[in-house]
Amino acid sequence: MASLNSDVIMGESSSISVPSSSSKNSKRFELKKWSAVALWAWDIVVDNCAICRNHIMDLCIECLANQASATSEECTVAWGVCNHAFHFHCISRWLKTRQVCPLDVCEWEFQKYGH
């Protein structure tokens, strides 16, 4: 009876070709190059900041304006308990005048911020 590792197909015919012992040890294929591809996205429904309208993974308008300066900070994302996400700079500027979420007008409370 053929083992599970061989390429022999068991059928009703009387002639069965069994691979020789030398072909069992040879490689069936050799991997010479492997290029991995991966995609990711934020776990949010809307992927644009509703304040500056830039993509949430891109720089906010404040960071874009200060891009030439040597002290440009990292542009992070801030989530509220309502699960709306904004650039941290954008929501900080918004919260100086109103303490509510710009989208659902619920009282703003940080759930998390950073990448």
Curated annotation (Swiss-Prot):
Keyword Cytoplasm included in the entry's annotation: yes
Binding sites annotated in the UniProt record for Zn(2+) 3: C82, H84, C101, D104
GO BP annotations listed: auxin-activated signaling pathway; jasmonic acid mediated signaling pathway; protein ubiquitination; response to auxin; response to jasmonic acid
Chain intervals annotated as zinc finger (RING-type): 60-107
Disordered: annotated span: 1-26
Pathway named in the protein's UniProt entry: Protein modification; protein ubiquitination
Pfam families the UniProt entry points to: zf-rbx1
This protein's record includes keyword 4Fe-4S: no
GO CC term, one of those recorded: SCF ubiquitin ligase complex
Entry binding sites for Zn(2+) 1: C49, C52, H87
Keywords (A to Z) from UniProt: Cytoplasm, Metal-binding, Nucleus, Ubl conjugation pathway, Zinc, Zinc-finger
InterPro entries membership: RING-box_E3_Ubiquitin_Ligase, Znf_RING, Znf_RING/FYVE/PHD, Znf_RING_H2
Location relative to the cell: Cytoplasm; Nucleus
Family label: Belongs to the RING-box family.
Listed PANTHER family: RING BOX
Subunit structure, interactors included: Part of SCF complexes, which consist of a SKP1-related protein, a cullin, a RBX protein and a F-box protein.
Name of the protein described by the UniProt record: RING-box protein 1b
